[in-house]
Amino acid sequence: MSGVAIHASSWGAALVRISPYTFSAIGIAISIGVSVLGAAWGIYITGSSLIGAAIEAPRITSKNLISVIFCEAVAIYGVIVAIILQTKLESVPSSKMYDAESLRAGYAIFASGIIVGFANLVCGLCVGIIGSSCALSDAQNSTLFVKILVIEIFGSALGLFGVIVGIIMSAQATWPTK
């Protein structure tokens, strides 16, 4: 049993020795990278269905590009939050680098980046799948376009929820004063 406690404490000790700036940089990178991955995945899902359905019904091409724009907005959410998180970075003297306040600020920026990145990944997938359904159903019955577009707007709200939670989390990032 004592081996488990030593192993767990060594992980905690290892995490505390990592610079808070490293956690901050990883959080900012995850915010952008995973958000762009979600947007690209959504565009791929929507675009492939849109191209396939446009063969049968060419009229749907320009109308259903709104789904691609919703997917692009997901990447923009990640970039905006990454800029906000980057403005939270401040220089700290090396004597206060591993203080509790510095570690909390680094972890808060890291958590914000993870929350926003993965919320936008899920949002991109959701908007892509709904956009695909919108293109395929619009090719069959044009009266369904507006109804499914409303559902797509609700799907894109997932990304906005992630942005809001990320901004609230980043408010906890206060670095120690000099």
UniProtKB/Swiss-Prot annotation:
Q: Does the keyword Endoplasmic reticulum apply?
A: yes
Give one GO term, molecular function aspect.
Answer: proton-transporting ATPase activity, rotational mechanism
Which Gene Ontology CC terms are recorded?
endoplasmic reticulum membrane; Golgi membrane; proton-transporting V-type ATPase, V0 domain; vacuole
From the Swiss-Prot or TrEMBL record, state where the protein is found.
Endoplasmic reticulum membrane; Golgi apparatus membrane
Topological domains on the Cytoplasmic side lie at 46-64, 130-147
Q: Which domain of life is it from?
A: Eukaryota
What keywords sit in the KW lines? Endoplasmic reticulum, Golgi apparatus, Hydrogen ion transport, Ion transport, Membrane, Transmembrane, Transmembrane helix, Transport
Topology feature Lumenal, residues? 1-24, 86-108, 169-178
The annotated site for Essential for proton translocation falls at: E72
Its transmembrane ranges are 25-45, 65-85, 109-129, 148-168
Enumerate the InterPro entries for this protein: ATPase_proteolipid_c-like_dom, ATPase_proteolipid_csu, F/V-ATP_Csub_sf
Q: Per UniProt, what is one Pfam family of this protein?
A: ATP-synt_C
Q: Main site of residence?
A: endoplasmic reticulum
- Of which family is this protein a member? Belongs to the V-ATPase proteolipid subunit family.
Q: What is known about its subunit structure?
A: V-ATPase is a heteromultimeric enzyme composed of a peripheral catalytic V1 complex (components A to H) attached to an integral membrane V0 proton pore complex (components: a, c, c'', d and e). The proteolipid components c and c'' are present as a hexameric ring that forms the proton-conducting pore. Interacts with APD2.
Show the PANTHER family listed in the entry.
V-TYPE PROTON ATPASE PROTEOLIPID SUBUNIT (PTHR10263)
Q: So what does this one do? A: Proton-conducting pore forming subunit of the membrane integral V0 complex of vacuolar ATPase. V-ATPase is responsible for acidifying a variety of intracellular compartments in eukaryotic cells.
| Name of the protein | V-type proton ATPase subunit c''2
From what organism does this protein derive?
Arabidopsis thaliana (Mouse-ear cress)
Q: What is the lineage of its organism?
A: Eukaryota, Viridiplantae, Streptophyta, Embryophyta, Tracheophyta
Identify the gene encoding this protein. Answer: VHA-c''2
